[in-house]
């Protein structure tokens, strides 16, 4: 029953219309990351998350994309990404970035402080975290200035028509995998030993964003340069895209699970 619900939910979420600007990882990708993260939680933490959310974690995976244009949540419109400076370093401490608010929420809820919050505030904070942690592992959700990094402002091609790299990488989780279920995506994710999981979960959202920026520079950009024709990609090229995406999904899922555990684990 639970697996069937998740399958139905993923199909329903994927059917929602979300603009390219709004949707890091697209709807399916966010749902997959949230589903995988929930599967990694121990029963105690999972139960507390569901208690405050009144739903599963994947249920709220794309909430921020829908809420960003609705008051009073328009304030979060720019929290879906974080700036990179001219020296390829993440910008720290800027309140209009998502990494700033991930760390703010982690600090405000740490050491049992969530118990002093209203249930509604805990819920909204969880909804932010569920989405933003995923966002900051999407290679195109780091902001490169056109002035300092003009090379990253270009177009790909899809059957001869221009397509932005943002549009491609947002949907890369489901690229040539449209029929995959949430369970299939979870089975595809490499599971880590507790020791390796803790190592991956270390650091701040700024560290993770820096890592994502480096992934873009070192792997995504070389793999899909300007003018790449998506419809004519070789099996090797597709495999390269999948290897990049699979690693980012793994990182996002483990880190989201880690953040939720640090908040709720007694």
Model region roles, listed by residue range:
Residues 23-132, 139, 144-266:
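N-terminal, motif-rich segments that launch catalysis or mediate targeting to/interaction with membranes
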């Amino acid at each position: 029953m639970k697996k069937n619900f998740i399958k139905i939910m993923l199909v329903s979420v994927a059917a929602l219309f979300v603009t390219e600007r709004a949707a890091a990882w697209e709807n399916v990708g966010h749902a997959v990351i949230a589903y995988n993260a929930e599967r990694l939680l121990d029963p105690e933490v999972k139960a507390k998350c569901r208690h405050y959310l009144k739903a599963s974690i994947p249920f709220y995976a794309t909430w921020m994309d829908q809420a960003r244009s609705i008051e009073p949540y328009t304030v979060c419109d720019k929290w879906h990404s974080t700036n990179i400076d001219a020296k390829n370093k993440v910008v720290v401490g800027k309140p209009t970035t998502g990494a700033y608010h991930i760390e703010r929420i982690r600090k405000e809820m740490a050491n049992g402080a969530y118990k002093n919050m209203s249930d509604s505030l805990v819920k909204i904070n969880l909804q932010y975290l569920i989405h933003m942690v995923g966002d900051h592992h999407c290679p195109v959700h780091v902001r490169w200035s056109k002035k300092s990094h003009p090379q990253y402002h270009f177009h790909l091609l899809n059957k001869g028509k221009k397509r932005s790299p943002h549009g491609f990488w947002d949907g890369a989780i489901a690229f040539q995998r449209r029929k995959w279920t949430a369970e299939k995506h979870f089975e595809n994710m490499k599971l880590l030993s507790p020791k390796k999981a803790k190592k991956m979960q270390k650091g701040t959202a700024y560290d993770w964003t820096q890592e994502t920026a480096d992934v873009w520079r070192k792997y995504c950009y070389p793999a899909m340069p300007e003018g790449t024709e998506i419809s004519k990609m070789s099996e090797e090229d597709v495999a390269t895209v999948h290897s990049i995406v699979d690693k980012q999904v793994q990182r996002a899922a483990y880190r989201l699970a880690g953040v939720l555990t640090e908040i709720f684990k007694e």
